């Protein structure tokens, strides 16, 4: 066997007949498979043991030689070599064809390679190959052109006139003769000359032909090899034949296809030996050609060959294609051993790095480890005995299992794995029952809930794999989301509610204003019921020992609440005491107004003070997230995950104590709701009157009515929120961010509002009832449209989103950080992204975590804030924006010069860790997942709103697909191709509008449809590429008008626009990586003196290399223009044919690669997965291959012996 990690590239080409014979271990002469009585393979048949090797290990067919000691012997009776039966997976056979046969891929594919090479139309080729016409191979004195087609009658006429003086043939033989006669060098010269003179269609045809001729010439493939004389037969184990229970046989379709070929081939041989009439031989040759076509690609030409039940047979091509093909089914993803799956349940008592594994499952997964340990401890005598102990589940087995799984992480995965947080590592603990226990905080990353979701468990086996799982994949290490660098493990639902309830303050709480010496007294008082969680109290500030308190503050009393004292115990000591949910309090210090000088208090003491003070807002979900981010910024990951665990315990404990429930009585209906509705009803009447008088159009009336009712709902919502009691459980749930929002609440207690019809149009009759009052039948019926649409949308769009992610990953999978600094001299100018006046993405977010490309001075003090190639940290970013600077040049993936992938400096910091990115990080895949994963949210957003009108987005996912596929957008904007001034805007014919732009040397007029809104005015100066009407720009056109940089920025802005409108934050750098992949190619306009072909797509780096070479030798360089490719096209145009073939259009990619003799240097991830090498990213990179793993760390259990949450 080859060592997979030891080869550097893979090459593909056409096989010559000699090559095919050299692979083969013998010719298959008979169509038989196995003998129906003995069930042994027939000699010389498709499963013959003499050709393909023995069916049983170390045993010949007739049984004369058995056992290993005869290894390598060839039996004198049956001729079978004694060896392992595994050779039947790798030994090939062959068929010697009685007549040459064309290979359907090269004759039928688009464009037909054979046709281009011979300069014949595919139809002419088909007529010759399938014996409908003769082709002239050698015209002799006939005056015919070479390659002319002759019908049967014409051929006879000529044959009678010039017997034996000219040659015309039918079938693949004629084509083969023509192909053998081609002189590639001569052809090349002729074509190059033709390029100089030709125009139009002749030019395009010449370029296509040139490409094929060049391919053959450079690859060393001979054109005649497209015609087969010998057919290889793949090894029998790959097209098996197995016996089913009932004694019948199931066989791979390939065997049927091979049998047809062999039968027809043998018949043809016999006919030729007998000297049968020409017409019969011809018919047989045609049938042989068709049989070989069906074997290689069934259904490509004519009707496919069908098996029993009219099912088309799967040919060799089908074995590679599609989701069930070899590439995607067996090479890119395999089923693995040491894995299990089960339903998940919540494990509130787990630590951040733990999961609960059901005992039986753990025993099965760790079976070999347990067996080894049992034998080592001498509990079992041998492996067999250990195995039976495990199967009996003896008591001692469990103790050993506990020992084995300690410190052995397992991977948990939930499908669909949309981003890298869909697989994380945990340390298993054994649990009773049959459900996997999952830590509640990681559910967000997995997008899991406990309504029946299932998860898969995998065991990393080798020491290196375990080390990687522990260091890189442990859940406690993955706190940040790679798409925006924000914490992904924020508490949710009960945990939020518990902490919210804990930090709530109430006016009427028992013993308000009590003063305590220290926190212990407070906790004792709370335990005894002297104070409530919500009681506002005072505590001597000095007892906190808080380093952020000033001396002055330490002499005073801190006014706070009992709950907040409990909450602050989980916060690290060096933090300010958190008394109000503000960034000021969190990042700097506790505000001074909460420190009260006891001497200034009046008669009523602190109680009187509290009566005059407003209540402080409790801590909601967003603020908890901010706390986590702040702790993460200041401390290690370990401290953060400890705090998260404490926050989780606190949340669960107090949400249980709060006992928050929802009852019908909690839904308070608004008293003056009817009055609001009546007012708006009057407004609608007025609009209807105006319409009836003909003052407004139908469209205006409809829009006005919809606006009136939307306003009514907003008003009711506003008043509801005002009138609500702050301790109302539903309000608490929505206010804390645990579940639900204002809109849900309005539907329960106010009115449901407007609904959308199935078409997506809003029905102007609103639902005035709320769920509390109950809906009328009509209202209920209208409601169902929205709900149904929500469900249908989700189902359809989830698939779309998954497919988008797949295409994105495919186009960017070879973008890996490959060097520290590419040394580019260009930068990207960034500023706020705005749409009109609306902010889409602020400047500060765009520069943070990137490297600067210029020196930035403070405009007033002139001090240097940052120098080129320095990382912009959050502090520096704040300094830059505070100094009033609104734009700057930064390093960007757009301007990176790295040949493959990007460099560290152009990428910036790694968002998943918050550190600088390291060489080997697979940033392309991360970018693709970061853009693809929220795609599902874009889609699912419609579903969660319960089908209320207005929240369903049309611009979401379809717009993202439109951008990345570089399609012509719907609602296209008109752009100007010249710089100048808008001279005139007038009506043109067919109700169109005409915009005239006058430039320095020319005047252009642009037509816009009558309905589109024009956004320029007469006399307004416009730049090249500026938008004249509202709408989306067609990116390909924009590229040629406005240039590369403008197009990159435009695509970036458009993608950000869609996501930010949905409230999804994605870092720019991910979009940059993707857009860069779409702009990797240029189209050659003139080839100059280089070897490039005009009109061909070439990688930018190859283009610059060719030109550099030309300049060196004082030759004419080539010229080219940048091309924007959609992601699907870009994936198929990648340098690696393995990656492209496994993506889409497998046969086309492989045909092309074989003719060009392409070599795949295995630079991307996919290619290496396919051939089974370590991927060249992360620890699989060459530079890390000598890193060894050793164990030095203390067990985690010791690190974790920390104080638990205060009771």
Swiss-Prot record:
Amino-acid positions noted as binding Zn(2+) 2 in the UniProt annotation, renumbered to this chain:
822, 896, 903, 906
Annotated Zn(2+) 1 binding lies at 60, 62, 75, 78
Catalysis performed (reactions): RNA(n) + a ribonucleoside 5'-triphosphate = RNA(n+1) + diphosphate
Q: Which SUPFAM superfamilies match?
A: beta and beta-prime subunits of DNA dependent RNA-polymerase (SSF64484)
Enzyme kind, highest EC tier:
transferase
Q: Cofactors per UniProt?
A: Mg(2+); Zn(2+)
Q: What is this protein called?
A: DNA-directed RNA polymerase subunit beta'
Give a short account of what the protein does: DNA-dependent RNA polymerase catalyzes the transcription of DNA into RNA using the four ribonucleoside triphosphates as substrates.
**What's the family?**
Belongs to the RNA polymerase beta' chain family.
Q: Which InterPro entries match?
A: DNA-dir_RpoC_beta_prime, DNA-dir_RpoC_beta_prime_bact, RNA_pol_asu, RNA_pol_N, RNA_pol_Rpb1_1, RNA_pol_Rpb1_3, RNA_pol_Rpb1_3_sf, RNA_pol_Rpb1_4
What GO cellular component entries does it have? DNA-directed RNA polymerase complex
Q: Name one GO biological process term.
A: DNA-templated transcription
Q: How is the cofactor bound?
A: Binds 1 Mg(2+) ion per subunit.
- Keywords tagged on the record: DNA-directed RNA polymerase, Magnesium, Metal-binding, Nucleotidyltransferase, Transcription, Transferase, Zinc
Q: Is Zinc a UniProt keyword of this protein?
A: yes
* Assembly mode: The RNAP catalytic core consists of 2 alpha, 1 beta, 1 beta' and 1 omega subunit. When a sigma factor is associated with the core the holoenzyme is formed, which can initiate transcription.
Recorded hits in Pfam families, A to Z, give:
RNA_pol_Rpb1_1 (PF04997), RNA_pol_Rpb1_2 (PF00623), RNA_pol_Rpb1_3 (PF04983), RNA_pol_Rpb1_4 (PF05000), RNA_pol_Rpb1_5 (PF04998)
Q: Which organism is it from?
A: Staphylococcus aureus (strain USA300)
